[in-house]
Structures are given as structure tokens and as C-alpha cells.
Design a protein with these regions (language model features):
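Extended recognition/assembly regions associated with phosphoester-bond processing machinery
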Residues: 1-487
Length: 487
């Protein structure tokens, strides 16, 4: 295909707007400017999470266990059957500590990142806490459950002579209400008084999802990106692949589009840099490499506007580190931003552009289905707490806990929310995805009220060459591969 040239001002406004079957929600957008503060205490987040989810968990537990509730975890009595609601806290000796951060600040060699926080000898402890205090938990059922710090649960059991609560069973909030298909678009039409467009007919489109491009600026990266662009646009591959590509209505890139940044330099390397040449605009121009962002920008421009793009930041991308990560700045994409919503329309209800840089996590409606997903950091952090390697089961647990990032802020950096926690899941998605996982996987889970969610673990494209396609009518998932054969 031919890339579109010229500035955004020369392109008709209508052509820069995204197709009507797409709505991006601002669920995870942080306050702007002076309204964004980092002086709050993180402890308030867990209290806020408990306050918001406790009534829901209590309702589910009361239906199952009836009249055995005690209001506070410290009100349990030895030998008496009862149930309590609280926040799980995992005491693990291998979890990162504040001293590790201090070591980094003072140029002391910090311990390498751990693959798991759980210790092989099983010395970790599971506790439940509320505003009154903490209570240690034990019991066989704990081994059958995925539990991490920050999950809100109800536990039934008795306190033993050691003051430990022996758990017989555990209940969680489970999946929340699932909106009907096209709910956002139909609501917007009703509010505006506009007639509903004829967009609800079966389209047979595909929504493409990809993660982990990890562009480093090498020649191999450029060749792989060109193959990917040609495949998505139907210019490469057999008739079957071309037919699938022709139906792609949107591409969602779920984080880690750029390769990992350079490691923190040693004291000697830093001193050598200071003795080196002059700096321009505050950085050493000789060590700056713009090729990764240039290649990503060129790739996006090559598929826009044929395929609209939703771009999530990831752990290795130039965005804020803490969750929720804010959209990548349009200045990084001088070519692709032609197709983004113009700054003049930011304050208007104009909808997103064909190129839509969004937050991580992100929530939106695509082809009428509610999508919710992230660049994968919350799932990867939950993985460190448990013995299991089943990423899809972890994703299912996060949905049933109704929390996008339960381990934040304990071991996953996040913004210190005070009045509301947007990381809580209030609407059950139809498709829930996590980027940058070790391998592709998909599963369908169901809720107590008939909710049905398609879980998708997205592999790193850099390692697998895999692109995931979701059918816009059936939500069936399939994979196509873009292989670079070296001779």
C-alpha cells in the first residue's frame, strides 16, 4: 500500500475520524497538570478497595453461608464457625524491599529481579486484613486457590488455639455485570438524540491484537515490520491470509512496542559519559538512537488509515512507569499522528482518531464488544506470587476479584488514587487480553449471571511472529504467523 503523505491539516477531518464501531473510554486517564499529586499515602488504596468491594463480597457470601458473619477480622472467636471479609496480604521473604531501592540509589549492586516471590520451602504466610488488623490464614483450600496481595475475599472457618484462622472455603466477588453488545454506542445515540446508524448488521470483520514488537532499530526489525505491515494489509501470504487481512477492522498493539531501554550505567560509565563530548538539549546526542521510534512511526504510517490502530504503552515504552500508564506522546510519531485526533478537538466530544494512543490498562468498545486489557504487567506480577504457570487462570482470577492490578501498589507501581480506584472492574468485558505473555493462549470463562468472557494471552511478536485475530461476531480466536526465514 502507499503511505499517506502530508500534514494533518491537508486531510479532510472526516477521514481522520475512527470508524463508528469504536469507542475508547477514559477509565484510566490520570488528572492533568497540577491536579496530579504523588504525596498521598498508598495505604489508602487498599482501604478504598475494601470499602468498594466489601458489600459485593458480603452479599455473595451471605447467600452461601447465611448467619455466620463477623464484622471485623479480629472479632473471630476460637472454636466458633464464622466468616469474614478482608484484603489478602502475602508475607513473602523474597518480595522486593525498600532497601533494594536504596541500594540502587547509592550505586550498590541490587539483587537481580526474581522470577517468583514464593519461596521453595513454603515459608510464606497468607493473611487477611481490614481496618481492625490482620489475621493469619491456614488450611488446605489455600493451596487450591490463587491468592495474591490486594485480592478481596470472604473466608469461612474457625480460629485454632494458635490464633490462626483455619479456612474451610473462600468466596470472591465473581464477575460483575456484563454490558450488552453495542451498549455504549446505543447510549451515545440516545443521549445525542441521533438516530442509530445501521452498524449492527453482521460485518464478518476481524480485530487484530499484537504485543511485544520490541523494536530496537536493527535491520532485522525493519524487515520484520515490513513483513507484518504487508501481511496486515493483505499484500503478503496466500489467498487465505489475504482474505483474513481484508477483514481486519482494527489493530490493537498491547505494549512493549519498543525494545527495553539501556540498563542503568555503572559509576565508571557515567563518569566517562560526563568527560565525553558536549550535550545538546540535556542529553548526549552521540548516544541517542532515534531509529526505534522512527521505525515504529513508519510502520504505523504504512498501515494507516487502511487499518485503524489502538496503541497501548508497555513496560519498555517511553511512558510513565506506574500503572495506569498514560498514552504515548504524539510527538514520538510525527507521521502517524496525522491520523490522530487533532489537539483542537481534545476538549470536544469528537471521538478518537484513526490512530488512537491510549492508556495501559485500556477499556473500550470495538465492534460493539467491550474490550479490557493491558500490556501484561499486572498478570506478570501476579505470576510471581503463585506456583502455577497458567497465565489464563491468573487472568480469570483477576476478573473474579474485580481488580485489574491487585498487587498494586505492593509490588507493582501505581498512581496513589484517593477518592476512587479505577483499577477495580465495574463492567465485565467481553474480551479480556494481556500482552507480552510467554505464549499464546485463549479460554472462555462464564459468570454466575451468564457472563461470557474470552481470555487472550498475547505472545511477544518479536519472539513468535504471531498475530491474534478475534472474529467480530462470534469472538472466535485464531492466530496467523509472520515468519522471517533466515538463509
Amino acid at each position: 500500500m502507499t503511505a499517506v503523505e502530508g500534514s494533518g491539516d491537508n486531510i479532510p477531518a472526516a477521514s481522520r475520524e475512527a470508524p463508528p464501531a469504536y469507542t475508547s473510554l477514559s477509565t484510566f486517564e490520570l488528572p492533568k497538570g497540577e491536579d496530579r499529586h504523588y504525596v498521598q499515602q498508598y495505604a489508602d488504596m487498599y482501604f478504598l478497595r475494601l470499602v468498594q468491594l466489601k458489600p459485593v463480597v458480603e452479599q455473595v457470601a451471605a447467600e452461601a453461608w447465611e448467619n455466620y458473619q463477623v464484622e471485623r477480622v479480629l472479632d473471630v472467636r476460637q472454636g466458633e464457625l464464622c466468616w469474614v471479609v478482608g484484603t489478602i496480604y502475602m508475607e513473602m521473604p523474597l518480595k522486593p524491599k525498600v532497601l533494594d531501592d536504596i541500594s540502587k540509589e547509592h550505586w550498590i549492586s541490587a539483587p537481580p529481579p526474581r522470577e517468583k516471590y514464593i519461596s521453595p520451602d513454603g515459608t510464606h504466610e497468607t493473611m487477611i486484613e481490614d481496618e481492625s488488623g490482620r489475621l493469619r490464614l491456614t488450611g488446605r483450600c489455600l493451596k487450591d486457590q490463587i491468592l495474591v496481595t490486594g485480592a478481596i475475599i470472604a473466608a469461612i472457618g474457625t480460629e485454632n488455639s494458635d490464633g490462626v484462622f483455619e479456612v474451610a472455603d473462600i468466596i470472591v466477588a465473581d464477575l460483575p455485570r456484563q454490558p450488552a453488545r453495542w451498549e455504549l454506542e446505543d447510549s451515545a445515540s440516545a443521549v445525542s438524540g441521533k438516530s442509530k446508524k445501521d452498524t449492527h448488521k453482521p460485518s464478518g470483520n476481524k480485530i487484530a491484537l499484537i504485543s511485544g514488537l520490541q523494536i530496537s532499530g536493527s535491520a532485522t526489525d525493519l524487515l520484520q515490520l515490513n513483513l507484518l505491515a504487508e501481511t496486515l494489509c493483505g499484500e503478503l501470504g496466500g489467498p487465505e491470509v489475504a482474505a483474513k487481512a481484508a477483514t481486519i477492522s482494527r489493530l490493537i498493539i498491547a505494549g512493549d512496542s519498543l525494545a527495553d531501554a539501556c540498563p542503568i550505567p555503572s559509576r565508571e560509565e557515567l563518569a566517562a559519559t560526563k568527560r565525553g563530548g558536549s550535550k545538546k538539549y540535556g542529553y548526549d546526542a552521540s548516544s541517542y538512537n532515534a531509529a526505534p521510534t522512527d521505525h515504529l512511526d513508519a510502520f504505523l504510517e504504512s498501515i494507516l488509515p487502511t487499518i485503524p490502530v489502538t496503541l497501548l504503552p508497555g513496560q519498555t515504552d517511553p511512558a510513565n512507569v506506574q500503572i495506569p500508564q498514560q498514552p504515548l506522546h504524539p510527538a514520538l510519531f510525527p507521521k502517524a499522528r496525522t491520523w490522530a485526533r487533532s489537539p483542537a478537538k481534545q476538549a470536544e466530544d469528537a471521538g478518537p482518531g484513526t490512530f488512537d494512543p491510549v492508556t495501559n490498562p485500556w477499556e473500550g468498545e470495538v465492534e460493539g464488544w467491550r474490550f479490557l486489557g493491558s500490556g501484561g504487567q499486572p498478570v506478570s506480577d501476579v505470576f510471581k506470587y503463585v506456583e502455577s504457570d497458567d497465565r489464563l487462570e491468573m487472568m480469570a482470577s483477576m476478573l473474579r476479584w474485580r481488580c485489574n492490578a491487585p498487587t498494586a501498589p505492593d509490588t507493582l507501581w501505581c498512581y496513589p488514587f484517593q477518592d476512587d480506584d479505577p483499577l477495580l472492574i465495574t463492567d465485565c468485558p467481553h474480551v479480556y487480553f494481556a500482552g507480552n505473555q510467554p505464549a499464546f493462549g485463549t479460554r472462555i470463562i462464564e459468570g454466575p449471571a451468564g457472563q461470557e468472557v474470552v481470555l487472550i494471552a498475547l505472545p511477544r511478536f518479536k519472539e513468535t511472529g504471531q498475530v491474534v485475530l478475534v472474529d467480530s461476531e462470534t469472538r472466535e480466536v485464531e492466530v496467523i504467523e509472520v515468519e522471517l526465514v533466515e538463509k
